[in-house]
């Protein structure tokens, strides 16, 4: 399926991007910083891989692979990523690694997948078992944090861990429903603080 305007837009983004300064995440560049490991870049790279799957155009795969390869070292460590930061947002970009590993089998991608999965093993949790959004936000569960962690978590469990963590993930969703869903509207609040220390 041809989408000329869409393809032109995506191609321009790629042409204006370098591996350190992607055009779609220009905020870092404006701050004088190189891009690191983050959900914004992860979302875009995953989109490029989906475009590659839909069109077969190798330029999308090649850019995506180069972008991630630039950040992932041979031992699986990831530039500007730290497990000990316990930032659930940084798990999201790990979804790119599943797609790339399936396409090219680079062992360093599998090692990086395992590294990110190790964060979930030690990520601080609420008493009911939900991942804290970030170590700097103790006892807080945010709705977007569910998007950041759970798809990666479930893909790992499905592909590599005989689905052992699926019940844990399900329970986290049920806790979110219990604490964050407005019964009258069916809509969800953005977050909750189990400690009740935050003003909201």
Regions found by a protein language model. Give the residues of each.
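Aromatic- and glycine-enriched pocket-lining scaffold segments that form the walls
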Residues: 127-193, 198-200
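Hydrophobic alpha-helical segments of small multi-pass membrane proteins
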Residues: 92, 115-119, 172
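Well-ordered alpha-helical segments within folded domains of soluble proteins
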Residues: 37-53, 85-102, 141-158
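Surface loop/turn signatures of beta-propeller and other carbohydrate-active proteins
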Residues: 4-15, 26-27, 77-82, 132-138, ...
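Mid-chain, structured segments of secreted extracytoplasmic proteins
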Residues: 60, 65-95
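Low-complexity, Ser/Thr/Pro/Gly-enriched N-terminal "stalk/linker" regions
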Residues: 1-72, 107-115, 119-123, 127-128
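Boundary/linker segments of alpha-helical solenoid repeat arrays
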Residues: 77-79, 108, 183
């Amino acid at each position: 399926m041809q989408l000329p305007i869409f393809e032109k837009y995506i191609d321009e983004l790629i042409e204006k991007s370098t591996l350190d300064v992607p055009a779609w995440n220009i905020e870092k560049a404006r701050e004088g910083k190189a891009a690191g490991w983050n959900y914004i870049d992860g979302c875009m790279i995953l989109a490029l891989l989906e475009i590659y799957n839909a069109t077969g155009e190798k330029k999308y795969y090649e850019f995506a692979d180069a972008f991630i390869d630039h950040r992932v070292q041979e031992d699986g460590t990831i530039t500007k990523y730290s497990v000990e930061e316990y930032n659930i947002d940084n798990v999201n970009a790990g979804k790119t690694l599943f797609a790339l590993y399936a396409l090219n089998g680079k062992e360093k991608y599998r090692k990086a997948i395992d590294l990110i999965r190790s964060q979930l093993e030690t990520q601080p949790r609420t008493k009911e078992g939900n991942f804290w959004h970030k170590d700097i936000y103790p006892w807080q569960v945010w709705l977007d944090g569910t998007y950041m962690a759970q798809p990666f978590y479930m893909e790992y469990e499905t592909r590599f861990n005989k689905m052992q963590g699926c019940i844990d993930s399900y329970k986290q969703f049920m806790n979110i429903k219990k604490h964050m869903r407005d019964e009258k509207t069916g809509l969800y609040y953005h977050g909750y603080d189990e400690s009740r220390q935050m003003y909201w």
